[in-house]
Amino acid sequence: MTKSKISNPKLPMALQTSTIFSLQAPKDISLNEIDAELNQIWQSYGITGEDGGLPSATRATTFTLVVYEPEETQYLLAALGFYNGPIDGILGPQMAAALREVQKKHKLPETGTATQETLTILREEFAKGQRGGTGGEHAIAGLNSGSPRIADEIALRNPCRIIALFPITGEDEGVKAQVSAYCPIQKQSSSTLICCEYITLSGTAAALERIGGMIPALLIGGLPKFLWWKATPDPNNGLFKRLAAICNNVIVDSCNFNEPESDLLRLEELVEAGVPLADLNWRRLASWQELTAEAYDSPKRRAALREIDRVTIDYEKGNPAQALLFLGWLASRLEWQPVSYQKESGDYDITRIHFISQDQRQVEAELAGVPVADVGDIIGDLIALRLSSTNPQADCGTVICSETGGCMRMETHGGAQSAGLFQQVTSLSEQKAEALLSQQVQRWGRESLFEESLGVTANIFKLAN
């Protein structure tokens, strides 16, 4: 499809304060009308408002993003009239506000996140509406807002087209399609609106798989294509295989994995099969990796790296994926081979892993899932890590902690005082999936460092089998 340029006939005054201008509100169409309807949007605007006094609107020519959103929160919020933004599977400020509204109405803790209690309420309300013949009517009407919001960070990257796939429960009634168009308001560019086309496809998982052959035709040729698979990737899932084969990058977030160890093994299988994979949770480790590397910048410290034979990593109990990926990265850089793997569950989730170094030294690593009162948005964030040696003369000790009091347990064990180097990781707001995705779509292809680290992590799990 070629780039189109249009004049905006009636730009509302509200545009000056809104972050998104709705060029075309979501409209129900049949599957074979998608391209024709999108073309019609541009043609209808192209013959209006030719006075040249208003900002023009141009369809972005950047990338296509396919979002597979198995978690039904956004769809339910829209169907019940709480949410009036695009159904894109991306958690943005408007989603959080809608969740808080539901929670306030039903006297639940106002977290702005999809807690289990909130989901239960949404499902019950949706079921009541279906029985009364009104369920889902807001799924369209509730989206007809004058100023809907694409998740801010994604909008700033000006995607050309977002295709959102929403598997839903219930009877198989085929696939429903909607198209719409939105233009993020860029403060630095008031003369032109860069617009994004939205295609939303919803139906049962079986129905979506049936029409999977049509989806590649909806991707815009000549532009990078990203698949954000917000479920556990299944190498045997037909729809996943079809989409992964045609996208430049397949993006997952292991912080949401229900069974992190077996799910990370699945990721390794995909890498071995040649899938260009990216894990947003891996990107959350960047500051920890950078500080660890900086700790051994000096020649003396670098020479002592081989003396490291004790590793302790504390993480927020609930998901060990970050801790395991960090350990996989460290082991891959220092060429350690895993030889044993043990787990203990209790107040703390303890994992003990033994490695053999290149010079046949024994290396012991302990991962501890620490219970915390407020987990926050990301389950399993790193809290602290300690690298040390059984050789008291070795200058290789390092302790790195998060700024949220992460060193308390390390200090109890004498680690922070005895370490040769102590550093803190500043808590970063961009650790949420929305912002990390915004960074990820600026690059594509295979990530060798991630793949090597994942390979070592997978070898650890295989010791348990």
Curated annotation (Swiss-Prot):
- Tell me which domain of life the UniProt entry assigns to the organism this sequence originates from: Bacteria
Q: Which SUPFAM superfamilies match?
A: PGBD-like
Segments traversing the membrane: none
Chain's role: May be involved in the functional assembly of glucose 6-phosphate dehydrogenase.
Q: NCBIfam families recorded for this chain?
A: OpcA
What is the protein's given name? Putative OxPP cycle protein OpcA
Q: Which organism is it from?
A: Nostoc punctiforme (strain ATCC 29133 / PCC 73102)
